């Protein structure tokens, strides 16, 4: 078995302990009958500042403020002739095309992996031993597609106009968050910084790359971890979300990437990285002594007929499950009927 003390990460254990010990100290000295909070808060971790929190009552005012700032900057850019209505409309083409193509690639790409490597179906929790290599593969492939599309559909001196579509889409995302998932309202923070970048782009012909990177930092620190966390936490079928978030993050970082002259070359570089990560994943795709094949074994009793069975989710029966199920186990649906799951 892999779940042994020797495989335990000491850093991971210390990390979990850093969560637990403050809670023990807090609750040990707190009246447990008075724990109910009057308000709900939004929480987000940021570098240097660490934990940032604010009440749910701030979400709508912040959303309204960001929307008004966005509209003001649009009118300001049009008035100063820094924005073009035609180019702003064209800016939706590379953005939506990248978003849709990468989403489709992420969804069907993982289904293709399951066809090429059927042994992955044996892993019930959905995250394979080489899962991190697949995340890297799909992320770099998404970047390659996005760089190639933006290289094809954008031109110089109109960088601010191409930033309107991503900002509008992020506003719509935050509107959906306000309605459906208020705990994720911290998504608005990188949009604030994006609007500052947008203002700088309208004021300066060639903004400082260092300043743009600084303003892009909140988006990187908040959204980049989510690209990995969704597949790790929910299984590799969520690679589609990683691909979509990669495009959304790329678009939010347009003030940095937009002024790159060699987007086509960067696309090729990303393809090379994607190829490397796919090859790496391929050589770690089989089960081995270090990457053991997982087994499932379920004890099932039909109380109506007072009969018991051994069942499994495994697609391939190995020596261990065979000793319980026999050499030719029958399909469990014949036993479970409508109770199968």
Residues covered by each model-derived region:
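Alpha-helical transmembrane segments of integral membrane proteins
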Residues: 69-341
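Short alpha-helical interface patches
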Residues: 11-15, 19, 58-64, 72, ...
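Short, surface-exposed, charge-dense and proline/glycine-enriched linear segments
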Residues: 2-3, 27, 32, 59-75, ...
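Cytosolic-side membrane-insertion boundary helix
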Residues: 35-67, 84-88, 132-133
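Generic signature of intrinsically disordered, low-complexity segments enriched in small/polar residues
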Residues: 22, 46, 57, 302-303, ...
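Alpha-helical transmembrane segments of integral membrane proteins, especially early/N-terminal helices
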Residues: 17-30, 57-66, 93-103
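Soluble extramembrane regions of membrane proteins in the secretory/endomembrane system
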Residues: 1-53
